[in-house]
């Protein structure tokens, strides 16, 4: 009987974790991050689920840079936004692991 109760508790915990993961994914889709380059002269905004939202370039930068430099600035801003999105995801899942006492090697994506 004890094994049945343990199994039932495990199934319940798994269902709760799955519900939490769904909520986290929704929250990440609603969370915006902004990557910046050249002190904010180039900005890329995307959701924490990596859906692009906008690209902004200060017009003065266009006058002062060539195409290759502009490409580099866009790439820097994109990488910055991606890092922020990755950090938001990591923070959300680390919090989930703590709340449900999940092991560090628990893979949320399999």
Go through the PLM ranges and name each one.
Residues 14, 50, 74:
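Residue-level signature of catalytic and energy-coupling elements of molecular machines
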Residues 30-56, 105:
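N-terminal intrinsically disordered, cationic/polar leader segments
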Residues 59-62:
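A short acidic/small-residue loop/turn micro-motif
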Residues 68-72:
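A short, well-structured alpha-helical segment
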Residues 73, 77-88:
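Stable alpha-helical structural segments in soluble proteins, enriched in small hydrophobic residues
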